[in-house]
Amino acid sequence: MKVIAFDECFTTTVGELPQDIKPSSICGQFLGSHQNINIQALINSIGLKPLKKGSAYKGNVCYESGRIIPYNDFLLLAFTKLDNVGNGRMTREEFLDCLEVLWKEINKYYAYQSVAIPILGSGITRLKDVSLTKQQLLDMIIASYKLYAEKIKLPAKLYIECMRDDDFSLNKIGEYI
């Protein structure tokens, strides 16, 4: 199963405007290859409840960061909060809270299959109160998972997918925690 990070509103409009999903992002590529997906029908099918307070972006219906919608071999993640112009922004604390909810949701939906997640927060999402490298984000994701009590059960595994980057090394995992 692959985790696909959306914004808190599960936006499906792909384009270049600030509020759009960028075509080159993982989410944009997913939407490009699943053009007929009906996110609202999926939300309704699992009974996912929206937050009482709407998004900062136009008051749109939004969902708690970390909540998942299962779809075939994918886990669609409500990830980043939107600001008033539609940019993805969250604080470090909101990022950690999202991870805590994410682990619970994965535990609910993974069905003893391996799960792959990207380095969340390393795309165009902006952390409001701190600037973190991909290395630091990876360390936070790993540390958060280690603290979560109910791990994915063998033979299934959790994979964190990352691209080669000058700002990243598997040899440096754990240096920033």
Language-model segments: residues:
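Macrodomain-like recognition of ADP-ribose-binding/processing modules
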Residues: M1-I177
